[in-house]
Amino acid sequence: MKLLHYILTTFVLLSLVACKDSCPEDLWEPRAIGDSLYVQLTLDLLNSSSTTRAVPNGGEEGDGWEYGYTYENQLHNFTVFVLGYNATINSSPNTIFVGKRYFSDDELEKIDSLHQEELNLKGYPEGQEVLKDVTTYEFTIPIVREQAREMPNADTYRFIVVANHGDLTETYHTLGDLRNGMPDKAWTDTSDGPVRFVMSNENDQYHSNGTGTTEDPVCLHVTIERMAARIDYDPTGSTLVSGTPRYDVKGVTPGNEVLAHLYVDRMAIVNGSQQPSYFFKRVADDINGTNLKYLGDETPIARGEATNYVIDPYSTQKTTPPNNELLTTLYGNSRISNAAALVGSDKPTLSLTSNTFPYTLGYVNENTFDAPQAWSYYATGVVVQCRYAPQKHFYTAYNATTDVLTEGAYELNQTFYMVEPNTPTIDESQRLYFQNEADAVAYATNTAKKHFGKVVKYENGVCYYFTYMRHSNKVEVIHNTMEFGIVRNNIYRFKLLPNTGPGTPTPDPRHPEELKARVYVKKWLSVEHPIIYV
């Protein structure tokens, strides 16, 4: 396999088979033998580019990113599609490729070995690599051309790349076919973890020069990006207790007193799209695809709010409340109605080794929908199962006549009954926790002592929180364009800042606007979700 992090130059003579077999004989013919084009193609994995999120500046040219893990960056194989005559990714769907070439796993393994030999000759130890941001290949291409036209000028070539999806040269013969193409899957899950992340062009910009000779090759620079997105949990702010993140819960009243501890046991992605998106990102003015552009830019305004949509293959179906069949097709077993099972007792608990390094929950496909449909049945999010442990305001008895509470010491995993006042805003210092239900009810209904509250039971102290992945909008304005959603090659990272008491005693997928979940979103280089308040 080949990493996309170092520069490599090799010469490969291509017996490139273009689309002649699928094209009318009277329109296309091979270029004359001996009149070949010499090309230097540089593939640049999007590892030093910009964010689509506000960190602090959002949009296609934002400023937040981070490098991917090694297994996310590996290049196993790739197919090159060549456009000529100034054609671009947004040209007519009937546009014919003037050339195609597949670089197989075996070829890249050989190239990798040659590169390692070069390093060894230069004194580098076996296995050590010189890390760069690009990989360069040099090769000759016999071109297929239109009979009625001269050969394309060297500066009119554009290269389209799809990596880690095998040989596509016989699958796609026109630009329209390729643009409508979708991978079988955007990554491959194995017993050792995810591998073979499918990648494709990140933009429609090509840096080219040269005349196409050996001495002056056509130099093309193509930036590629992963089709998958990643969701991370950032445990910063927690203390690890035997690998379990534990948070201090404090009230907002003066004193900064620790009122409870929150132990985070399990997490799972909900509404993770099971359907891969198109090979190339699509943007449009609205969810229906008006003024659709391939590899277009997301365009935010000053506050980070998006002004256009990224379109996935199902976006136009997500403009009204869904039916069960659509939700099952989109999200499979990860649909939010299955949240309880996703963090059930048969699922492993978190066992972290660091409270400063992000923990990857998993990978998801693009998932975008109409802004008015920003509800929990479409939005990709995370369900978090925790144990809540009151440290203050825990009582073992209550005398309703004297209105005297008997304080006690809470034991972790003990069932408790929370009394919460019936007020519009509640601080954690206003909640009371009781060892038995009778005392909790007596206190909550003791109107003679001006107590007005509700009682909630927490079996074994277990509670649940939900949060949903925000893609744009760094202010708390609800239902803006692309506020919630998943876009390729982003890392959606969330923090927990517990300050609102225990979550719900059973999974309760509330609407996104009720969660106050601000999410950091960076390019992969990464997407960070702002702090999620739970």
Language-model features, listed with the residues they occupy:
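Contiguous beta-strand segments within globular domains
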Residues: 30-65, 228-234
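Sec-dependent bacterial lipoprotein signal peptides
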Residues: 1-18
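Bacterial Sec-dependent N-terminal signal peptides
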Residues: 16-43, 233, 489, 531
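Structured interaction patches on ligand/partner-binding surfaces of diverse proteins
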Residues: 118, 123-125, 166-219
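Extracellular secretory-pathway ectodomains of glycoproteins
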Residues: 217-243
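Hydrophobic, glycine-enriched assembly/anchoring segments
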Residues: 478-534
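Intrinsic-disorder/low-complexity, polar/charged segments enriched in Ser/Thr/Lys/Arg/Asp/Glu/Gln
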Residues: 36-40, 134-138, 217-219, 230, ...
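Tryptophan-paired
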Residues: 64-169, 234, 240-488, 498, ...
